């Protein structure tokens, strides 16, 4: 048991969240590089670039230079602990889509992590998607570290950025590093806790020219000139006006330690990675419908937070991403697939480095493993060593955009149904079958999602489909006594459909119609989100 406890204590599982173009994918690459997981940190460049980010593995992502699915990457990271001894952590990094149209996949991924890194663009500050994602983190009181990026560009003042984070996101900021200049005048950062100055070298491998001890170091005046005295004055003001780091407040999701840097130049990234390992919590306890599951429990438990089809077109595979919540996984172990009430032997679980995969011999609480899925595993499914648990808090969100699927070749109807069913089970889209017709209606939280579905249907399933507009304003899951739902279907069945799980959904043609229908059927609940169970 002691080795189980120590293995779990080494784990750090986190996601990176940001608004599009804040530099999240670049930061992901550089974290992997500093962790020794990749040899060359390839930037996401123009459409025809030869190299693509490790975490952007789907063909469409490579074309567009945006992340449209969440990638999972695991790597060991050795750092120097406070006592000077080397300490090795196992880092599980979940790269999430930054584009606003892929938020549902991001929301679900945030249920699988124990902490998150929020990337803020120093030029643009807090942006819309950052606000949405932080609110999802807040629902679970997820600890957040902040990385203010692009210090090599002319941006807003650091004090202004911290004020905006506190005002807009309602979270205390505790600066851990402080920038020396900005843009062309950017010379490095001062570490407030360690009293060290880290100088910036835009041409060096790791972005750092030198590290000097102490603000009073005369070497600082020689290198920085007049900027040295400006820095001393600024740090005095910062120490007086800002919050000092409070680990308890950080772990409660009420305070965020803030680091400054330039990911594209590798600067500040290693400090962030060290902080992630030092400050972020190891795997946390998880709620189920019946009890709390502690990570150090001897028996394995885990839940599916994502399903991805065709990660490798050569394999035509579907992988269920499982967050290990407690205990230890061993290759070949027999687990109860709770929703199916069946015991299955898991022989071919894998760990990930984006699309690269390795067969897993063992995994511990906090790790993410991939389980081959032949159509029986769904989002939210639970695997245990026998206990019939159901983990809570894995959401499905009401779509905001709707399309009707139509085929150019009617002979491909079976392939269309299979493709849409699989993509819906992944959570890439939601599929609805209206009770009153044979149509297939798709729902998504962002309009670009339909482009992704069309692209994947064509390239992975050989189906050329057209998505036409559908007169639907919003969707609500129906909850209530079966007799009450039957009454609603009898009166308004033309607006009722079944979702992929076979649950009844009301597809409202307008918000006025929804309000009137709710008034007519007060004993039926119309739900905007559905817990995936």
Curated annotation (Swiss-Prot):
S-S bonds: none
Protein's cellular compartments: Cytoplasm
A single Gene Ontology CC term: cytosol
Coarsely, its chief localization is cytoplasm
User: Which positions fall inside the tr-type G domain?
Assistant: 9-284
Gene Ontology process terms (BP): regulation of translational termination
Q: Which residues form a coiled coil?
A: none
Where on this chain does GTP bind? 18-25, 95-99, 149-152
**Keywords attached to this entry:** Cytoplasm, GTP-binding, Nucleotide-binding, Protein biosynthesis
Q: Does the keyword tRNA processing apply?
A: no
MF (Gene Ontology)? GTP binding; GTPase activity; translation release factor activity, codon nonspecific; translation release factor activity, codon specific
Q: Which Pfam families match?
A: EF-G_D2 (PF22042), GTP_EFTU (PF00009), RF3_C (PF16658)
Its family remark reads: Belongs to the TRAFAC class translation factor GTPase superfamily. Classic translation factor GTPase family. PrfC subfamily.
The task this protein performs is described as: Increases the formation of ribosomal termination complexes and stimulates activities of RF-1 and RF-2. It binds guanine nucleotides and has strong preference for UGA stop codons. It may interact directly with the ribosome. The stimulation of RF-1 and RF-2 is significantly reduced by GTP and GDP, but not by GMP.
UniProt name for this protein: Peptide chain release factor 3
Quote the gene name from the UniProt entry: prfC
